[in-house]
Regions:
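Specific transmembrane alpha-helical segments of multi-pass solute transporters/efflux pumps
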Residues: 83-126, 168, 252-270
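Hydrophobic alpha-helical transmembrane segments of multi-pass integral membrane proteins
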Residues: 23-31, 35, 60-84, 100-103, ...
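Helix-helix packing/entry segments at the starts of transmembrane helices
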Residues: 69, 109, 113, 128-134, ...
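Glycine-/small-residue-enriched transmembrane alpha-helix faces in small-molecule transporters
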Residues: 1-65, 177-204, 329-333
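Hydrophobic/aromatic residues within transmembrane alpha-helices
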Residues: 46, 66, 70, 119, ...
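Hydrophobic transmembrane alpha-helices of multi-pass small-molecule transport proteins
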Residues: 78, 82, 142, 151-173, ...
Length: 333
């Protein structure tokens, strides 16, 4: 925690001409997806009552409350730290940029979570994740349509392999793999759009502000969104114990504060297509950790999917031909 808070103290909202470093970008994205993999394993245990305290199982935590609390708690933790170290004046944003970051928090972070959980409720985890990980295709299409990138064979291959690998890793080829439901499928597609949006919009806003400012206002706007969807009295009515709230505090750090700070840092060093292909490591880590920690089986088809995702990441990070576009921002560390 000390080193994490120390990095906040050294951040500055002023642009510094730091050269983008792709290796650091991939390391940041990998760290973020690893944390999300841990969060997925913890979340699964929380949903099913698999959390233990002093040898006793804690009562299951509602997925909606788990998603809501992690953004709200993250904002409440981050705000006083930044306020104390930077002062209120350095936390203010122009109205236009404030609006953009609010949209990033609501349409990107909060909406992707909301539609993802709605899709799980209406279909299953495999269907939700498989459709959500069509987001790399959406990002590539957007970047090409706007003229930011060319549709090279390298990019198309990497995006295609990332999608196929994620589908196999999640278990689309297994029993109960893909389940159709109009509302559930629609929600999963909207989750993919939201995921793609916060990769592209996040990359753009990080050209002007450091990751901590972006994280502060995205968690704020996402928290407000969740308060509308799930009002405070519903939280009170859940009657969670002190141990459950302690878990929610830890979960906020593992699922939002740490991984989003890493992911936003990665977006400062990588253009959105490469970043979102690398993000396909998340289901890989989730599956491996679930196998190691929860005893879930890892089938050969899932192992093949993991290998394909890794191949996609290797392909997307290969150097482009001379004259390729440069769409990374100058990192504000």
């Amino acid at each position: 925690m000390k080193s994490w808070s120390g990095s906040i103290l050294n951040d500055s909202t002023k642009s510094l001409a730091n050269k983008p470093h792709p290796i650091r970008g991939y390391a940041y994205i990998a760290a973020a997806t690893f944390m999300w993999g841990i969060a997925a394993t913890l979340g699964r245990a929380a949903f099913t009552g698999g959390l233990l305290s002093s040898g006793k199982a804690l009562q299951p935590i509602d997925p909606l409350i788990l998603s809501q609390s992690r953004t709200t708690i993250s904002f409440l933790v981050l705000l006083p730290i930044l306020w104390a170290r930077r002062g209120s004046a350095n936390l203010r944003l122009p109205a236009v940029d404030f609006g953009r970051i609010v949209l990033l928090g609501v349409l990107g972070v909060a909406a992707s979570n909301y539609f993802y959980y709605l899709s799980i409720q209406r279909t299953n985890v495999a269907t939700a994740i498989i459709l959500q990980y069509t987001a790399p295709v959406l990002v590539l299409l957007y970047m090409v349509a706007r003229g930011f990138q060319r549709p090279t064979l390298q990019r198309i291959t990497a995006v295609g392999l990332a999608g196929v690998g994620s589908a196999l890793a999640i278990g689309i080829a297994g029993p109960g793999g893909f389940r159709l439901d109009a509302l559930g499928v629609g929600a999963a597609i909207l989750a993919a759009v939201s995921f793609a949006f916060y990769n592209v919009a996040g990359h753009q806003i990080l050209a002007r502000y450091d990751r901590w400012i972006v994280l502060l206002y995205t968690t704020f706007s996402a928290g407000v969104f969740w308060l509308i969807v799930n009002p405070p009295w519903k939280l009170v009515a859940a009657h969670y114990s002190g141990l459950q709230w302690e878990f929610l505090l830890v979960f906020a750090f593992v699922s939002v504060l740490a991984p989003f700070s890493f992911y936003f840092a990665g977006l400062q060093h990588l253009e959105p297509t490469r970043a979102i292909v690398a993000s396909c490591l998340e289901p890989v880590f989730s599956i491996v950790l679930a196998a190691l920690l929860l005893g879930e089986s890892l089938r050969s088809i899932q192992a093949l999917g993991i290998v394909i995702v890794l191949v996609a990441i290797v392909i997307v990070q290969l150097p482009e031909r001379a004259g390729g576009e440069v769409t990374v921002v100058e990192p504000i560390e």
